[in-house]
Amino acid sequence: MQAALAAIWKKNLHQTRDRLTLLQRAADHLSTTRTLEEDLRGEAVSTAHKMAGSLGMFGLHSATEAARAVEQSLDHNGLPQPERLQEQVDALTAILAPHLSD
């Protein structure tokens, strides 16, 4: 079972990296402009939701919680606090960093 999960993880590694990049882009945009366009925000919410739902399957429960925190920050009325969103995205990235190499 572990070998099968490892193969799936490796196959989808690029997608995980792309998802982190999108979340970082949203956090950077919010920090720089203090705005977040609805299309970018919607894409970031969807991405964080997908990550929260899938990372636990690989035993990355702390990453699941971090992705859920990002999703909740983005998916409430009003803009998230830029510093808080950046901290949450950084935390998710740090948790996943050891698992992102080929």
Give the location of each predicted region.
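Long, amphipathic alpha-helical coiled-coil segments characteristic
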Residues: 1-45, 83-100
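Extended, amphipathic alpha-helices with heptad-repeat/coiled-coil or helix-bundle character
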Residues: 38-76
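A structural signal for long alpha-helical coiled-coils and helix-turn connectors
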Residues: 24-31, 52, 59, 71, ...
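Residue-level signal for short amphipathic helical patches enriched in basic/charged
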Residues: 11, 15, 58-61, 77-80
